[in-house]
């Protein structure tokens, strides 16, 4: 986090960065998330996603979710506006998700770039109040076939 903050500051000295050199846990997540209006997820595990989801619900904050696995990605916006669908609606059985085997090693470099760009677009739509936010919907992409879909939750 600190190295990333230093590199970003070198690119743009006008931005304000608050790096957290600690893992997000039940002990610190509530206070960290409380400082922000929108939460954007870039984590790589189910436990952290459930934690972020539950705190965003408690604090009534939109949660912009993105996940990748190899050549596949998905994005959604939870707990936004009148749409109260959340991560637990997408994956209701937390224990089952924790038992899943780890994904295969390696991610195609453009997969996180595409998913992150879609997440950033959703944040801009929320902030600026334009377009249809992915609230209550899940957008998926498979980069092997370039097929994308949007599903209602």
Annotated model-derived regions:
Residues 1-153:
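Adenine nucleotide-associated cytosolic modules
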